[in-house]
Amino acid sequence: MDGNPFEETMTLRSDVGALLAEMPIFSGLDATLLREIASAVEWLSLPGGAKLFSAGDPSDALYMVLSGCLGAFSDDPTRRRFLARIAAGDMVGEMGLISGRPRSADVVALRDTELARISAKAFNEVLRGQPEAMLRIARLTVDRLAQSQSPAAAARSRGACTFTVLPQSVEVDFGGFASRLVKALSELGRAELVWSVRAKTHTSQWFNRIESSNDYVVYVADPTPDRWTKLCVRQADALLLLARAESPAGNWAALRWPHDHSMAPQRSELVLLHDSTLETGAAARWLADLPELPHHHVQSPGDYSRLARVLTGRGVGLVLSGGGARGFAHIGVVKALREAGVPVDLVGGTSMGAILGAGVALRWSTDELQERIRRAFVDSRPLRDYTLPFVSLVSGRKVSTSLYEAFGDLAIEDLPIDFFCVSSNLTTGQSMVHRRGTLWRWLRSSVSVPGVLPPVLHNGEVLVDGAAMNNLPVDVMRELGRGPVIGCDVGGADRAFTARTDEIDVPLPWQLLRWMKARRQRPSIFQILWRAGMVNSNASTIAHRAQSDLILQPPLAEVDMLNWDAFDRAIQAGYEYAIRKLEELPADSPILRSAVADA
């Protein structure tokens, strides 16, 4: 055994004064006051899976994590969400203690955890008569709260630091995968790989030392449910369920083995290893019994770097808005990001932004993206298959054909880069996010401008253009908690949408010819329907811009949303604008910190 666990625990406890001095809210207090606070400390050992407190409980104490790890979870019984990781050296509960408000989240031990507890009564008694110290603590707490609420900080707090690779069978190359993942994590910080042969004889304090001396630790579990596997599960912030994509879908024996790490399933993620080519249909097969599980495709060396960023809350998400022909500017933005070495680890979009985002998720080169989109929307003129306007002005067949020719029978879950698109459900009155299913079909729903294209009818519900309710779905990307988010909004003010005459009614039949000759004085029915389908989401778009770590709004006000011939001009405008904005970013921007040389 590596040391005496009782002695090591006592060493941690004897250093509580030094630990207090390192805590931001106590730093700067004089030594006498720190000793008084230290004397009021109580000790608490919490086994993995045990709850420290629940949302709504009275805020009767603050806690310092000496070893182990806690997780904060939302208290929504219908949709439990992981909010933050509280690691050794962190503090929890001080906000409620100072504000007097009840606990705002459930806090659970993600593994065996040692805590130092200071009751509200002891805290107040020590600081009574110390107004300057109390004011300092209050100010630091407010500052800490403000910092923690920044989008980038929130994503990092939800990112994992310790991972357990759980192979589905002995046929999986779990050793090679773990080694390559550690190499990728080493690009982000100090990382270490822990095998059973190295760690089986060590105490929990040995594991704590390994984790405290590294930014990231990867444990390699056995495919069988043995003691080592149980220990790995208890140590993990995230379980990586590893499988060969081409293998028949199966279960993980270790997950059927009873253990007391009740929160583990909240942090499980499926990783599918591919050979030389991506196995289409594999994700749906594996996700049939795990429909809500996040999943990742790993094939090339770059996929390990992407996986490392996404797992640790450093993945870059790109969100592309709708905007008709203005959406071509997204191609220029993608080109600029690639030239700057900024990776796109996740992508989502609405309407035209969804189509371009799907191309990015397929890892099309910039030239291929440009050529395919030109062929689909400029050369083929898909909005010229007019029909009797019972449901829409256009039949939609040419749009459907163009989308099918571009994407075939691909499913969203098979895309190498995580992708989603958004449509508007007129039946429920809510925005719909599509993460699974046939790609071209959901893209077709996302671009179905009401009145211009027929809606997509699905399970008795009517789906139309996502821009009607959420034209810039940064909120959807932010909810994933994977890292910084870049939003590109091309659906803003439209100077081309103007009228140069004053009138109320359409002219009488014998005046129509002269009226049509002057059509440039008034918007067309296409323009009216297109614009009307977007303005409803203006308020949400403004809010979602603010949620972006970087918001890009290329100058496209002079580009008509239906001017497909503005293809090259829009691309160039997006490219030049994005280059300027990226050059203006501060060196410590979370987006630039994620930049890679081989993006």
Name each model feature, range by range.
Residues M1-P167, D173-G175:
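Cytosolic regulatory regions built on CNB/CRP/Popeye-like sensor folds
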Residues A153-L188, E192-V197, G315-G322:
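Walker A (P-loop) phosphate-binding motif
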Residues E211-R227, V464-A467:
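Switch II (G3) loop of P-loop NTPases
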Residues Y219-Q299:
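Conserved catalytic-core segment of NTP-binding enzymes
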Residues S321, P343-L362:
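Catalytic nucleophile loop
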